C-alpha cells in the first residue's frame, strides 16, 4: 500500500475540479501552510468530519540510549497530535472490516 502525497492530492484536484496544475499545487500548499501557521500560533485546527490537530506539551522524562544503555534525559517539548473525528473513524473502521 502506498502513501498519498501532496503531489497526488494536487493531481486529483486538477482532474476532479478542472483547476490547472499550478493552481491545484498552490491550493494544496496554501491549505497545509494555513494548518502550519495555526499550529505555530498555538491554535487548535478543527476539520469538521475529519479530525482535530492539537498541540500538547510533553514534560522532560528519563530515556535510555539503546546502544549503550546509558540513561539520558529526553527534553521537554511540544508535539502535534491528531485525533480523528467520528465520521473518519467510522469510515476507516468500515473499510478495515472489508479487507481480508
From Swiss-Prot:
InterPro entries: Hist_DNA-bd, Histone-like_DNA-bd_CS, IHF-like_DNA-bd_dom_sf, IHF_alpha. One of its GO terms (biological process) is positive regulation of metabolic process. GO terms for cellular component: cytosol. One of its GO terms (molecular function) is DNA binding. Disulfide bonds: none annotated. This protein is one of the two subunits of integration host factor, a specific DNA-binding protein that functions in genetic recombination as well as in transcriptional and translational control. This is Integration host factor subunit alpha. The gene is ihfA.
Amino acid at each position: 500500500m502506498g502513501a498519498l502525497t501532496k503531489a497526488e492530492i494536487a493531481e486529483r484536484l486538477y482532474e476532479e475540479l478542472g483547476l490547472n496544475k499550478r493552481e491545484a499545487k498552490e491550493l494544496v500548499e496554501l491549505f497545509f501552510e494555513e494548518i502550519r501557521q495555526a499550529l505555530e500560533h498555538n491554535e487548535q485546527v478543527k476539520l469538521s468530519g475529519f479530525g482535530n490537530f492539537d498541540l500538547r506539551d510533553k514534560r522532560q522524562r528519563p530515556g535510555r540510549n539503546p546502544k549503550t544503555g546509558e540513561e539520558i534525559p529526553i527534553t521537554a517539548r511540544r508535539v502535534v497530535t491528531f485525533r480523528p473525528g467520528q465520521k473518519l473513524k467510522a469510515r476507516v473502521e468500515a473499510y478495515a472490516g472489508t479487507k481480508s
